[in-house]
UniProtKB/Swiss-Prot annotation:
A Pfam entry, by short name: Cyclin
Name assigned to this protein: Cyclin-U4-3
Gene Ontology molecular function terms on file: protein kinase binding
Keyword rRNA-binding: no
GO term, biological process aspect, one: cell division
Family (UniProt): Belongs to the cyclin family. Cyclin U/P subfamily.
Tissue specificity remark: Expressed at low levels in roots, stems and flowers. Expressed in the shoot apex, leaf primordia and young leaves.
Name of encoding gene: CYCU4-3
InterPro entries: Cyclin-like_sf, Cyclin_P/U, Cyclin_PHO80-like
Superkingdom of source: Eukaryota
Amino acid sequence: MADQIEIQRMNQDLQEPLAEIMPSVLTAMSYLLQRVSETNDNLSQKQKPSSFTGVTKPSISIRSYLERIFEYANCSYSCYIVAYIYLDRFVKKQPFLPINSFNVHRLIITSVLVSAKFMDDLSYNNEYYAKVGGISREEMNMLELDFLFGIGFELNVTVSTFNNYCCFLQREMAMLMKMKSLFLEPSSFKISSKTKLVMYPHEEDSLSTHHNKKQLAAA
């Protein structure tokens, strides 16, 4: 309880700085997810059947899909970083289900849904997220459950873990811009100063293994 109070106090100080970096963070997330998806599309891998895998690739880009979620979900800034952490946990625990163009959209909407429910005091229900994500409520319910089992119900995120991932995403974006290898357009994400930021850390994670080509932090 004391840790939660300390984190909530810290969130008040983090709110404005986090608002400033969120456009870059979200753009980096879009780029990294697309890069991982395209890389795994070209790999010959044995992949187990999954509710996340679609028959065809969605026509909407990862960038546009994340923009749509950001526009309509109205969840706290931290939810997107925590969703990224959850996705990284998912690919580590599910080595035979790498992120690719056939499952990345469903994984994104589900990770944000789970993150918002865990992080925020108030969040939209599954039916609303299903409409935002372009799927049915029944499918959203199934994806949520499968995702929770996929990450072993490991929802807690420590402050240090959150900060590490946030810094990683910022560094990735800065490096991409410096190398002029970022092919996405400048961010169009708009940040509201009224968004509440809440975190509930209970564990320590490590970024030491984030260089596997199937993982989100892969180079």
